[in-house]
């Protein structure tokens, strides 16, 4: 049994790269179907209308339109995509 640790080894130096999470398309931005809106761990943001959710909780646009963020009375943040016709009516 060795009484001294073998040289040439390092216990440090394992700082992994960031995962590139966060909002990719902000409120008011135009998106087309399939565009990623948010990459997240867990559901910080929930899918609203015309937004799908992937198995890793990525939110993506199901149709073309404008991104819309809102917080509902239950305290959850929702992201929706408003189609072009509805977006004009909302303005």
Swiss-Prot record:
Ribosomal protein in keyword set: yes
| InterPro entries xrefs | Ribosomal_bL27, Ribosomal_bL27_CS
SUPFAM superfamilies in the cross-refs: Ribosomal L27 protein-like
Task: Tell me which GO cellular component terms the UniProt record holds.
Answer: cytosolic large ribosomal subunit
Keywords tagged on the record? Ribonucleoprotein, Ribosomal protein
- Coiled-coil-forming residues are none
Q: Please indicate if the UniProt record lists Ribonucleoprotein as a keyword.
A: yes
The top of its lineage is:
Bacteria, Pseudomonadati, Pseudomonadota, Alphaproteobacteria, Hyphomicrobiales
Protein name stated in the entry: Large ribosomal subunit protein bL27
Which residue stretches belong to region Disordered? 1-22
The species is Beijerinckia indica subsp. indica (strain ATCC 9039 / DSM 1715 / NCIMB 8712)
Per the record, the GO terms for biological process are:
translation
What family does this belong to? Answer: Belongs to the bacterial ribosomal protein bL27 family.
A Pfam family reported for this protein in Swiss-Prot or TrEMBL: Ribosomal_L27
Any one GO molecular-function label of the UniProt entry: structural constituent of ribosome
